[in-house]
């Protein structure tokens, strides 16, 4: 009997560790309407063609520690840098950029946040008042990313 209880407890504990946490991504349109929050905003700037963006999804954002931190302390936002959404952020209206030479247009919000240092993936952290605090460029491994998110 005692052995069965120990086995059952181990199964529950191991199952809890194996179960992965997923980031609860929001759209920029929904997040931009958020008011009276104490959480920071975290924005993942990506494109559909970006291999390193897909690797971040697969390896970094799927990490349970990273996902837990993002869900608990941030409003996590996925933003397609070549998308066509229109929204207001911190009293500014942003729209799809203008396509040049048939290339996909970079959204005006990307230019506003990243300036002339546009690259993917890139990440931005804003305070609850939607003012930019930090930009993080490029691929980052899960353990390093968790440390960045704590600070």
PLM segments and residue spans:
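Thiol-based oxidoreductase modules, predominantly thioredoxin-like and allied folds used
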Residues: 22-25, 63-103
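Short active-site neighborhood of thiol/selenol oxidoreductases, capturing the structured segment around
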Residues: 36-51, 76
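Structural micro-motif
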Residues: 40, 95-124
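A short, hydrophobic beta-strand/beta-hairpin element that forms part of a small beta-sheet core
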Residues: 76, 109, 119-135
